[in-house]
Regions:
Chain A
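Transmembrane helix-loop-helix hairpins at membrane boundaries of multipass inner-membrane proteins
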Residues: 1-10, 21-118
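Short aromatic-rich membrane-water interface segments that cap or initiate transmembrane helices
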Residues: 2-3, 70-89, 202-217, 282, ...
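Structural signature of hydrophobic alpha-helical transmembrane segments
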Residues: 4-15, 83-94, 136-149, 213-227, ...
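C-terminal ends of transmembrane helices
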Residues: 20-31, 98-110, 151-161, 165, ...
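Short helix-boundary/re-entrant hairpin motifs in multi-pass inner-membrane proteins
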Residues: 220-286
């Protein structure tokens, strides 16, 4: 792979960094300009992600990695950035969600407070960095960048609910950071390295004593990532936080839980994959049962939810629970089904988060909701929410989108949620009989059932009751992202095969960590000729 | 030396955990600070406890085991301190905001007797 090409992998981190810094310099009064710069940069990021996925996917399996040695130090000593199929796929999904959330925020939410656009770009920088890094400590740093930006975004449009939720969210994440650092310290003292590839290479031959230390360290690290991905009982912060955040921010937070899953997936298959000696399959049972508990917790929570934002939150919990369970099954055959479910559920839950805000306008005049959240901030901007074009037949649009979201999240035919769930069940039934598989089967069905009940109840109450409803004014830029995400979900159902093939290749990558290790460790520093 | 370090890390952790379980946000932030001190010390001693040894060689000499301290934990702990400091400061701002808006420093934003 040519040298110039590999260096593209730095761009998804640098682009948001510079855009964010630039946006900081522009006064809040130039709202349109700020939005324009932000949107352009986020769109560029999307195209970049498509390009990167194209590059990593088209290369043969033994050399598909884009490796950049920062500061030109060879792999275990310097920090490496690594782009492979898995990372670039997540990059693409993240960029998609970011675009949708940003367009949605244009007419109202972005103007609620200062520095929305800057924080948004820094959040993207943290996400992209965490996806692309190949070093444990660097991962910590990018996690903190991402979290700091997400604290700011959560508090965006400052009111009592957000402050209350924000305090809990920040404390939980600071504690998770403590665990993260403890884990890093233990892993370092066990192996003397923090580089993913080097760690994975050392795993098979580790002596017994450091191995135990490493297991303790890995468990500590897992606490941090599992808190992020809202496993039961570490995920109590999630429903409060999601329902307090403004919708575009909540949409981005949905992706953050998936980031926790991504890190677990990556580290688990590198460190505790089939050829990691005595550690193979470490703590898989724990993940399995904790995932099942999360699934059950999510299903119960969904049943108890009345507000739409809580329904969205518990849908995210269910999705996390199922993903963690599938990770804990440690069956390579399940991986592609798991990733398909991840993509489909992320898109659907995000669409639903954005949609709920539009649905809520049916029964409350938009202005009063707006005034409530504007209580403490910039009341003079209240009148200016007229940007964008209103679309006709708003109720029909809301109803149809709601049905689509419900179908995908509950996993009913004919949309992508059904394909994802069918895929999982199909693989599950092929495995030899065991209690946990049947538990998963039953819980999966129950979760689907509770989702249908919760969504039907909510749908009937919002669309069919005879109370005085007003047909809301929807802006094109608000309906557009929802429609875009749903169309994507629907096309996932139609183009399931190419995606499935890509996911199969990702699965193969994960099962052969050797490829990752060799390519990262064999990348040599470039020798620059003196001019 | 080991005993002193281990005990002090243990005490810091214990006090930190006690404090973050308290209901006042001021106690919580002190607890978080203590926890981050504990974890920084913990991170620092992963490079083994060595006194009076340089972290890197000033000129190109061959590496001799035991002559140098491990530089990596020192670099890590510096970064961790900076990040921990920044995020704690951020929490402090939110704490003050919450105090101002709700009129109480209870972590739930309301006193217990006002429970609905």
């Amino acid at each position: 792979m040519s040298l110039l090409l590999a260096e593209i992998i730095v761009l998804p981190i640098l682009l948001p960094l510079f855009t964010g810094a630039l946006l900081l310099l522009i006064n809040e009064r130039h709202h349109k300009l700020k939005f324009f710069i932000n949107q352009t940069s986020t769109l560029l990021l999307f195209f970049l992600a498509v390009l990167l996925l194209g590059i990593t996917d088209s290369a043969p399996a033994e050399q598909g990695l884009l490796v950049v040695l920062s500061a030109n130090w060879a792999a275990p000593f310097g920090i490496v950035l690594v782009g492979d199929r898995l990372a670039t796929l997540f990059l693409l999904v993240g960029a998609l969600l970011a675009n949708a959330a940003l367009i949605f925020s244009y007419s109202r939410w972005a103007r609620l407070g200062v520095h929305f656009h800057t924080l948004f770009q820094f959040l993207l920088m943290g996400i992209n960095g965490a996806l692309l890094t190949g070093d444990l400590f660097n991962l910590f740093v990018f996690f903190e960048v991402m979290l700091a930006a997400s604290y700011g975004l959560l508090l965006h449009g400052y009111n009592i609910t957000r402050i209350r939720a924000g305090m809990q969210y920040i404390v939980v994440n600071l504690l998770a950071a403590v665990f993260f650092l403890l884990g890093i310290a233990l892993v370092y003292s066990a192996t003397g390295t923090l580089n993913f590839a080097d760690l994975a290479a050392k795993m098979p031959t580790l002596a017994d004593e450091p191995r135990q230390l490493l297991h303790a360290g890995a468990a500590m690290l897992a606490v941090a990532f599992l808190t992020k991905s809202a496993i039961w009982p570490l995920g109590f912060w999630l429903p409060t936080t999601y329902s307090a955040a403004s919708p575009p921010v909540a949409a981005m937070l949905v992706f953050l839980t998936k980031l926790g899953i991504y890190i677990l997936l990556r580290l688990y298959y590198l460190l505790f994959g089939a050829n990691s000696g005595a550690s193979a399959g470490f703590a898989a049972d724990f993940l399995l049962y904790a995932g099942l508990m999360t699934l059950a917790f999510g299903a119960l929570g969904l049943l108890a939810s009345q507000e739409s934002s809580r329904i969205a939150s518990y849908s995210a919990v269910i999705s996390s629970g199922l993903l963690l369970t599938l990770l804990g099954l440690a069956e390579p055959s399940m991986l592609s089904a798991m990733l398909f479910y991840l993509i489909s559920s992320t898109l659907a839950v995000t669409a639903f988060v954005l949609l709920t805000e539009l649905i809520e306008r049916i029964y409350t005049p938009a202005d009063s909701v707006f005034a409530l959240s504007m209580e403490f901030f910039a009341p003079e901007e209240e009148k200016q929410e007229s940007a964008g074009v209103a679309i006709p037949a708003a109720m029909a649009f809301l109803g149809m989108s709601f049905v689509a979201c419900a179908l995908i999240i509950a996993g009913l035919p004919p949309l992508s949620g059904f394909i994802a769930k069918f895929n999982i069940l199909h693989h599950l039934l092929q495995l030899p009989f065991s209690l946990s598989h049947w538990l998963l089967l039953i819980l999966l069905m129950l979760a689907g059932l509770t989702a249908i009940i919760a969504f039907m109840r909510f749908g009937v109450r919002s669309f069919w009751t005879a109370q005085a409803t007003t047909s809301p004014r929807l802006k094109l830029n608000e309906a557009g992202p929802v429609l875009l995400l749903l169309v994507l979900c629907i096309s996932l159902a139609f183009f399931a095969e190419p995606l499935h093939n890509l996911l199969e290749r990702i699965t193969a990558d994960l099962q052969h960590p050797q490829r990752y290790i060799e390519q990262v460790l064999s990348t040599l520093p470039t020798r620059k000729e003196a001019p | 030396m080991e005993l002193i370090l281990a005990t002090s890390i243990g005490i810091l952790f214990a006090s930190g955990i006690w404090l973050i379980l308290r209901p006042r946000s001021f106690q919580v932030i002190i607890g978080l600070l203590l926890l981050s001190y504990a974890v920084n010390l913990f991170l620092f001693i992963t490079g083994k406890i060595q006194v009076n040894r340089p972290a890197f060689a000033s000129e190109a000499v061959s590496f001799i085991e035991g002559l140098y301290a491990d530089p990596l934990p020192q670099a890590l702990v510096l970064t961790a301190i900076v990040i921990g400091f920044a995020t704690s400061a951020l929490y402090l701002v939110v704490l003050l905001g919450s105090r101002g808006l709700t009129g109480t420093d209870h972590v739930d934003g309301k006193e217990l007797e006002h429970d609905e």
